């Protein structure tokens, strides 16, 4: 019994440790890169590996360019930086959605930002592409409806930020009826719910529009695209 007890305690401690938030910084004279990941994602090995791979890809150029710039023009140099902070936007027993608002400083006039996101199916251990939410042949119509709602949300947000209504065509720079022109999508939910209530489309400052406008987080309620969802995905939304 004592051995079993120790085994159970060890198992509990291992699970708790695996669910701890991850926070690691690498700092040199040329750059400082930091990666933070919510414990819920760290507890899923393949998801953790996906995030680590993205971070490695995103920081490769930062590391190379900063090291080169420090060597070639030290008098004008300040360290480059990249900070990714992955947070959960929704989770239930078989899905988890995360987003990261990345801070990027490449020794330019000002730092930049860029979002990234992942919707992960725990059952199949893979990223869910946006179009897979929709029934066969329905994705184009779904993206058209989502783009229309996103355009309205962007114009409202841009007007509030700038004080004047932008030209409607400005929205088209980053919004279109194509999953590659709908930012980075993540699932959203109301506190206490176990089902999603919509999606959010994420755009970092300077990623598409003028940096001075900051980032855009365009909330799209499920009612906009409900009719296009597969039966399985319809069941995931409230």
Say what each PLM segment does.
Residues 5-15:
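Bacterial N-terminal signal peptides
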Residues 18-238:
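Compositionally biased intrinsically disordered regions enriched in Thr/Gly
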């Amino acid at each position: 019994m004592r051995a079993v007890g120790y085994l159970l305690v060890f198992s509990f401690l291992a699970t708790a440790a695996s669910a701890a938030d991850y926070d690691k910084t690498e700092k040199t004279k040329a750059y400082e890169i930091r990666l933070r990941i919510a414990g819920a994602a760290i507890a899923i090995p393949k998801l953790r590996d996906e995030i680590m791979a993205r971070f490695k890809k995103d920081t490769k150029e930062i590391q190379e360019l900063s090291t080169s710039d420090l060597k070639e023009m030290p008098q004008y140099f300040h360290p480059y930086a990249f900070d990714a902070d992955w947070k959960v936007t929704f989770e239930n027993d078989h899905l988890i959605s995360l987003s990261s608002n990345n801070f990027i400083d490449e020794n330019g006039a000002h730092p930049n930002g860029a979002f990234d996101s992942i919707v992960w199916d725990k059952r199949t251990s893979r990223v869910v592409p946006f179009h897979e939410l929709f029934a066969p042949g329905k994705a184009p119509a779904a993206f058209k409806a989502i783009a229309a709602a996103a355009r309205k949300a962007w114009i409202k947000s841009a007007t509030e930020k700038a004080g004047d209504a932008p030209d409607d065509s400005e929205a088209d720079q980053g919004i279109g009826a194509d999953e590659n022109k709908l930012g980075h999508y993540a699932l959203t939910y109301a506190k206490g719910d176990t089902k999603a209530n919509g999606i959010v489309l994420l755009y970092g400052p300077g990623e598409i529009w003028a940096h001075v406008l900051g980032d855009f987080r365009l909330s799209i309620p499920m009612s906009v695209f409900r009719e296009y969802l597969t039966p399985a995905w319809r069941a995931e939304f409230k």
